[in-house]
């Protein structure tokens, strides 16, 4: 089984969204796709939060470049 990545999960989530928006799925099929989509969205969100925690901004202070944590405004 292939390792789940952010990119593959996002692509699958986009496909599920298209399938749900098409209106061609049964109620049961729609619920299954919705559940799968929720799981994929949670995975993507976790990946984004992890990436955000790793982002650092390089600041020049006293002639030296220093890494500081990223803070949202």
Swiss-Prot record:
InterPro entries referenced in this protein's UniProt entry, alphabetically: Exonuc_VII_S, Exonuc_VII_ssu_sf
Substrates-to-products reaction catalysed: Exonucleolytic cleavage in either 5'- to 3'- or 3'- to 5'-direction to yield nucleoside 5'-phosphates
GO cellular component: cytosol; exodeoxyribonuclease VII complex
Location in the cell: Cytoplasm
Keyword Cytoplasm found: yes
GO terms of biological process kind: DNA catabolic process
Xref: Pfam families: Exonuc_VII_S (PF02609)
UniProt keyword list: Cytoplasm, Exonuclease, Hydrolase, Nuclease
Major localization class: cytoplasm
EC number: 3.1.11.6
Molecular function as annotated in GO: exodeoxyribonuclease VII activity
Family matches, as PANTHER family: EXODEOXYRIBONUCLEASE 7 SMALL SUBUNIT (PTHR34137:SF1)
Task performed by this protein: Bidirectionally degrades single-stranded DNA into large acid-insoluble oligonucleotides, which are then degraded further into small acid-soluble oligonucleotides.
Family: Belongs to the XseB family.
Record note on quaternary structure: Heterooligomer composed of large and small subunits.
Family annotation (HAMAP family): Exonuc_7_S
Name assigned to this protein: Exodeoxyribonuclease 7 small subunit
Organism: Desulfotalea psychrophila (strain LSv54 / DSM 12343)
Gene that this sequence comes from: xseB
């Amino acid at each position: 089984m292939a390792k789940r990545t952010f990119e593959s999960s996002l692509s699958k989530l986009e496909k599920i969204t298209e399938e749900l928006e098409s209106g061609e799925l049964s109620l049961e099929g729609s619920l299954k796709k919705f559940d799968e989509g929720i799981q994929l969205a949670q995975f993507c969100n976790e990946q984004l939060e992890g990436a955000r925690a790793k982002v650092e901004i390089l600041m020049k202070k006293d002639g030296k470049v220093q890494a500081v944590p990223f803070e949202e405004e």
